[in-house]
């Protein structure tokens, strides 16, 4: 514990907790302080002016990160026939129908993203209580219920990140690795923030994007000026 405390203190050194940094400066500070023995994930957290308890203030969507996420994504696809073949050819890790349902019901969930063709949803719907809490339930709003199986698998493998606002009005996601070039992290952060901005619900009132912070997996959070993050939208 003493070693961990020393590492955390060292990571916080030189960071003013009261200051709001530009995105570029925050990225530099985080990369300089990422000393874990693995390639830490670069994370972004956005506080939104919404109350997700109201349906007209729910924020949900997907962002295709221009430089990928840096992580290996295992994709499962519910499909039959030609669409199952399409999924396999596109690189899906697991493809099935009733057999995949039984595997999941048996407690085996060894995938990070789940895609389904529309005709499979009555079957997939039986897994709502299992997949829903894990954020794995296919949903047409984020492109995971679709006939374009090839495109959906490609997007998932290529760095598509789903997001959904939490009860406290926060959206967060991993948007790369600290080993990425600074500019690639900046581009990913801006793409994600823009996707969240475009997903602004009709019921949102006042300032929509209130605060933004970035961090690495093991590092401290750094406050960031929203204006330095939003590339094509305003808070």
From Swiss-Prot:
CDD domains: Ribosomal_L1. One of its GO terms (cellular component) is cytosolic large ribosomal subunit. GO terms for molecular function: rRNA binding; structural constituent of ribosome; tRNA binding. It holds the Pfam family Ribosomal_L1. Keywords: Repressor, Ribonucleoprotein, Ribosomal protein, RNA-binding, rRNA-binding, Translation regulation, tRNA-binding. GO terms for biological process: regulation of translation; translation. It comes from the Bacteria. Belongs to the universal ribosomal protein uL1 family. Part of the 50S ribosomal subunit. Binds directly to 23S rRNA. The L1 stalk is quite mobile in the ribosome, and is involved in E site tRNA release. Protein L1 is also a translational repressor protein, it controls the translation of the L11 operon by binding to its mRNA. This is Large ribosomal subunit protein uL1. It comes from Methylobacterium nodulans (strain LMG 21967 / CNCM I-2342 / ORS 2060).
């Amino acid at each position: 514990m003493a070693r961990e405390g020393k590492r955390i203190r060292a990571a916080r050194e030189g960071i003013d907790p009261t200051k709001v940094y530009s995105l570029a400066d925050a990225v530099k500070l985080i990369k300089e302080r990422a000393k874990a023995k693995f390639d830490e994930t670069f994370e972004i957290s956005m506080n939104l002016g919404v109350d997700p308890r109201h349906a007209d203030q729910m924020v949900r969507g997907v962002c295709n990160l221009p430089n990928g996420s840096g992580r290996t994504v295992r994709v499962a696809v519910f499909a039959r026939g030609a669409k199952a073949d399409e999924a396999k050819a596109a690189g899906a890790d697991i493809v099935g129908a009733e057999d995949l349902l039984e595997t999941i019901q048996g407690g085996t969930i060894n995938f990070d993203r789940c895609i389904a063709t529309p005709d499979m949803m009555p079957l997939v719907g039986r897994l709502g209580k299992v997949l829903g809490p894990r954020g794995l339930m296919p949903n047409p709003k984020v492109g995971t219920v679709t006939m374009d199986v090839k495109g959906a698998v490609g997007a998932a493998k290529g760095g598509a990140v789903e997001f959904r606002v939490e009860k406290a009005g926060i959206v967060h996601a991993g948007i790369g690795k600290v080993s990425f070039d600074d500019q690639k992290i900046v581009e990913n952060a801006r793409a994600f923030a823009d996707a969240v901005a475009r997903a602004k619900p009709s019921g949102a009132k006042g300032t929509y994007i209130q605060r933004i912070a970035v961090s690495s997996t093991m590092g401290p959070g750094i406050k960031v000026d929203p204006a330095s993050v939003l590339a094509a939208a305003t808070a």
